Amino acid sequence: MQLLVDALRDALVDTWQCSVSHRRDAPIVSVADNYDRLQYPSASIARESRYTRYVSDGVMLRSHTSAMLPSALRALGRDPNAEDDVLIVAPGITYRRDSIDRLHTGEPHQLDLWRIRRGASLRRDDLRAMVTHVVETVLPGVEHVLTDATHPYTLAGWQIDVKLGDRLVEIGECGLAHPEVLRDAGLDPARWAGLAMGLGLDRLLMLRKGIDDIRLLRAADARVASQMLDLTPYRPVSTMPPVRRDLSIAVAMGTTDEDLGDRVRSALRDDAELVESIAVVARTPASALSEVARGRIGLAEDQENVLLRVVLRAVDRTLTHAECN
């Protein structure tokens, strides 16, 4: 994964002839840096505890690597000898309450790349050129698609997808750095401008190596782990059979797929790596079930019955039915 970070940094520095600021901050951050200083509205759904891992009222595990940018920008604003053109490189693990499938994990690796320049303005054409450089560097020969998107900390934003066969796969987002984000850090937006980009490193590495299961990136099996040291195509170790289990559970009305995924991870602890995916097959409100059925499930009147399909598969061995049960 570090090879991707290095390749992207070198490609952009060669193109822009700018200086570099590397950030590798601690994952516990202030809510202000993760949300407020990036212009997230106080009522943003992203702030809800079902999506964010709070440590206390004002502290949290960062939900994106963009949380490193406010402090990076403040440091730039305080530096009397700051360079006129700087690429901020901020990789790291992020922490989310997310659904479980072959492309998602609750602790994804991300990378923020922000170009901050004093003097000449930066426009959407500059942003488009940045996207092209990034995609050509990490996924040579792969076509990308830009879709208008809104992000609190940018203007004129895009979502970045790449074409994989007949489908699109999202790899990141970008935009022009929001003037208020710059101003809040002590950088006068009349004198400074920026290009902001956030990328999913796990997703990029999977696409580069031809990996279809995100758990392989963290596999302990030496046959798998040894292949994560370079960018050559992945050679499958073996194909293990999946085991499916359907669970009928009582939950509060409106419990999201992300909540269910987080509960599965918490319940299984170290065995959570065996879960390939979870999917809600059906939702039935208590009012639609007989009293006998509600009693059997232990379903209260203000709850709903969820039929949850859990697919278990180890990346390096065959699971026994006893283990799965």
Predicted features and spans:
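Short secondary-structure junctions
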Residues: L12-S19, N81-A82, V135-E143, A267-I278
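Extended C-terminal subregions enriched in glycine
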Residues: L122-W158
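A carboxyl-terminal module marker
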Residues: T150-N325
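Amphipathic alpha-helical segments
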Residues: L3-T15, D126-L139, D259-S266
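Long, well-ordered mid-to-C-terminal structural blocks that present hydrophobic/aromatic surfaces
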Residues: L113-W114, R118-G119, R123, E136, ...
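Class II aminoacyl-tRNA synthetase-like tRNA-binding/catalytic domains
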Residues: M1-H104, I116, L168, E173-L182, ...
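Long, charged, glycine-rich C-terminal linkers/tails
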Residues: C18-D33, H144-H151, E276-V280
